A protein has these predicted regions:
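Active-site-adjacent loop/helix segments that line or gate small-molecule/cofactor pockets in enzymes
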Residues: 1-21, 44
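Glycine-rich loop-to-alpha-helix module at the N-terminal edge of alpha/beta enzyme cores
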Residues: 34-116
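Active-site core of PLP-dependent enzymes with the aminotransferase class I/II
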Residues: 170-172, 176, 188-214
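Conserved PLP-binding catalytic core of the aspartate aminotransferase-like
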Residues: 18-19, 307-311, 317-350, 366, ...
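Active-site PLP attachment segment
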Residues: 235-266, 278-285
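Structural signature of PLP-dependent enzymes
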Residues: 289-314
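PLP-dependent enzyme catalytic core of the Aspartate aminotransferase-like
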Residues: 294-296, 304, 355-415
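PLP-dependent aspartate aminotransferase-fold enzymes
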Residues: 81-185, 307-310
Length: 415
């Protein structure tokens, strides 16, 4: 089971881990119980809402016409043209069906273009060997990017010393890595818990340009959430390559790697291929998703929703005399209670909200389906639970309120 969807990440032994159907921001489990999803919304894949009628209709039309052929589907050409229209700095595109694949494609091409093996990274970039090699020799190198104590068993030992993590907004650390190693690629998420400081992204761009390093922005999570396209557009910094996923197909598998011609053409000197990257459903879903996004200005609406949620968390905390830390993109908002019992409180929220018909923890991926009425209902349900947490801060035993174990800690990236 996918790590992010395991019951242990939410409510061990009690979380209804499997679904029967979805619609909007509603999820039904296998027993027919209905829940309002105020959590990860398919791990951020459904910004338009689950089971979106227009996207699903386009997909069903493709299913009826045929999904696979000896020929290529024209939709991948149309999608490439659209992504390049949205990102004029790019000239070419390649498609896959998962974020990990898109990251692996980008690294293969960038290494081919630079002629160098070593990569500096900041953020979460999938599960492939090239990335997990960062933990060879020190299983905490990815602690601030993926998970603490991750043992990279199965990753060839000879990849040790090929990947160097650096911390977001720490330009001096990156510069030292570049000065002391033959770095050919810098790969990073554009924004993490907070935005760039002290012209960080511009300085990274300048460093990459001066040293002949390929700069890659991983927008698999951040793309199409605060801008129509990559969030790098907000900061006026253009990479050499970028990847998009999650929101791109509104729940259907499609990811994209775009880049400058002089970089992307290096793919011709190596081998990158997969049969099912040529299926038709993914690009069809992406084209319709982008059409709906552009018409509805979805990035503005989900940002507005997320901003409202973040403010109301703070208001609710103030009402109950709690101190919380709010972080993330507005449309990927998260909070944590400033307490040694923070993880227990997160578990308590999930437990109590589940009983009220909500899938909830301390992280919300906003979607168009999260209307004001839905958000109001969520906060009405959450209010007394914050009261319970305050009681625990004053001495009540939170463990006595829990019906099972405390949830596990999760990813440390944009959330």
């Amino acid at each position: 089971m996918l790590l992010s969807k395991r019951a242990e990440m939410f409510l061990p032994d009690q979380w209804p881990a499997y679904f029967s159907k979805t619609k909007g921001c509603k999820v039904w489990d296998l027993d027919g119980n209905e829940y309002t999803d105020m959590s990860i919304m398919g791990i951020g894949t459904n910004t338009l809402g689950y089971n979106h009628e227009e996207v699903d209709a386009a997909v069903m039309k493709t299913v009826a016409a045929g999904n696979m052929s000896t020929f290529n589907c024209p939709e991948e050409v149309y999608l490439a043209e659209k992504l390049i229209e949205i990102h004029p700095w790019a000239d070419m595109a390649r498609f896959a069906r998962s974020g990990g694949e898109a990251n692996a494609i980008a690294i293969r091409i960038a290494r081919a273009a630079s002629g160098k093996d070593k990569v500096a990274i900041c953020g979460y970039h999938g599960w492939h060997d090239w990335y997990l090699a960062a933990n060879l020799g020190d299983d905490n190198h990815l602690a601030g990017h993926l998970l603490s104590g991750l043992d990279p068993k199965g990753v060839p030992q000879n990849l040790r010393g090929t990947v160097y993590p650096f911390n977001y907004n720490n330009y001096a650390e990156l510069e030292e890595i570049v000065n002391n190693n033959d770095i050919g690629v810098i790969k990073m998420e554009v924004m993490r818990n907070k935005g760039p400081e002290d012209n960080f992204l511009h300085r990274v761009r300048d460093l990459a340009t001066k040293r002949g390093i390929v700069l890659i922005f991983d927008e698999c999570t951040s793309g199409f959430r605060q801008t129509f396209g990559g969030i790098h557009k907000m900061y006026g910094v253009e990479p050499d390559m970028a990847m998009f996923g999650k929101a791109l197909g509104n729940g259907y598998g499609i990811t994209a790697t775009i880049g400058r011609r002089e970089i992307m053409e290096s793919a011709q000197s190596t081998f990158i291929s997969s049969t099912f990257w040529t299926e038709r459903i993914g690009p069809t879903a992406a084209l319709k998703t982008l059409e709906v996004m552009e018409r509805e200005k979805s990035w503005e609406r989900i940002t507005e929703t997320g901003t409202d949620i973040m403010a109301r968390w703070q208001t609710l905390a103030h009402k109950h005399g709690l101190k919380i830390n709010v972080a993330g993109l507005p449309s990927i908002a998260s909070f944590g209670v400033d307490s040694p019992n923070a993880l227990a409180y997160k578990t308590l929220i999930t437990q109590e909200m589940l009983g009220k018909g909500y899938l909830s923890s301390n992280l919300i991926f906003s979607s168009l389906a999260h209307t004001p009425d839905v958000v109001d209902g969520y906060f009405n349900a959450l209010d007394p639970i914050f009261g319970l947490i305050k009681e625990c801060e004053q001495g009540r035993d939170v463990m006595a309120l829990l019906k099972g174990p405390i949830c596990h800690a999760g990813f440390k990236r944009l959330n």
